[in-house]
Amino acid sequence: MESPSFSKPVQSATVIVGTQFGDEGKGKLVDYLSDKYDIVVRYQGGANAGHTICFDNKTIVLHLLPSGIFHEGCVCVIGNGVVIDPAALLDEIRKVEELGYEVKGRLFISHNAHLIMPYHKRLDSLHEDAQGDQKIGTTGRGIGPSYEDKFARKGIRVVDLLNPEVLQEKLRDNLAAKNKLLKTIYEKEEFDIDAMVKEYAEFDKIIDPYVTNTQLYLNRQLKAGKTVLLEGAQGCLLDVDHGTYPYVTSSNPTSGGACTGSGIAPNYIGKVIGICKAYMTRVGNGAFPSELSDETGERLGQIGHEFGATTGRKRRCGWIDLVALRYSLAVNGVTEIALTKLDVLDTFEEISVCTSYMLDGKEIQDFPTDHQTLSRVTPVFKTMKGWKATNADARTFDEMRPEARNYVTFLEEELQVPVTFISVGPGRDETVFR
């Protein structure tokens, strides 16, 4: 006979994932949920993504620190899957402290997280410039080259900052190779090895109070009954394995990446909340079937303030794409949807939804992840009546405009996943729960 406890799930962790091309509004949801969880974890990416948070008439953009840092009872963790620019991280810590928030004792950084070095950033920009028309659209923050070194087993990790001899040896080995590349391939100035060794040796005492084995810490906290919220950067369609390759990021923003990027055991994951905008955006290059290259697309961008939080680049805009969303929901095992920026659609007479694609004369429902095929599809749209009014004062679904409710209900029926969170404005309180 099976033991009564044999199949009992252990579910104390929730993952928040972007289901589109990033920039879905994860910062607002994580900010709202942070005071309901004991620990908030960032599990992948680096300073190439920005989470925008609006509160107390302030707009704050975080690139590395988890959004929970603004909730005093919340512990924040930067996991092993994140690549860290030490100078950028310390600058972000300083800015948060200047706002009156305590960081020491509330922030833990994985000793296994890899570092972004100055040569990563320079090589990132040089490689992108050399691509010409084939540019990926990198932010130039050194993310890709840092991950390259990680998987080539040449990377420098946070723990190396605490060991001067190891740091010096790794820096000299890396710079010998990088300087040769800079000089012979790109014909650029080499880095001063001694100067960089001296600069990075000074991070030792500054970063030491934050560094720990976060894999063990998180699993022990979960075993003790603590709750954990995991926040990813970017979105599923930019995942290096599951996204629109090669126009992707260098890590795994998907829910599976939450485990590998934090060290949390999979059986602790109870919920996966998928975030999507009420429309769609993409920054940089790559196929975008529902893109609007007309006045409507411009209007979406202007109303939605669609400029990258990290680079300031203008985002491409289009209608929501249910083909892409169905794929993202499946890959991530999404249990509920958080719909953001519904207010951007408040002034539109009509709103369209991409429900399928046409490919070589046939209608398809499955999302092609290879860029060559995706770039050949054309969207099939269903047009709905807009609500032409604000929902900012609504706090329940019934208080929303009928046409807005119809829009949300249609998305639910098509996606077969409940929409439980609806952002009707940028503020913390401008939210409808179901």
UniProtKB/Swiss-Prot annotation:
Mg(2+) binds at residues 23, 50. Binds 1 Mg(2+) ion per subunit. GTP binds at residues 22-28, 50-52, 315, 341-343, 423-425. IMP binds at residues 23-26, 48-51, 139, 153, 234, 249, 313. GO terms for molecular function: adenylosuccinate synthase activity; GTP binding; magnesium ion binding. The keyword Translocase does not apply. It comes from the Bacteria. Substrate binds at residues 309-315. HAMAP family: Adenylosucc_synth. This is Adenylosuccinate synthetase. The lineage of its organism: Bacteria, Pseudomonadati, Chlorobiota, Chlorobiia, Chlorobiales. The gene is purA.
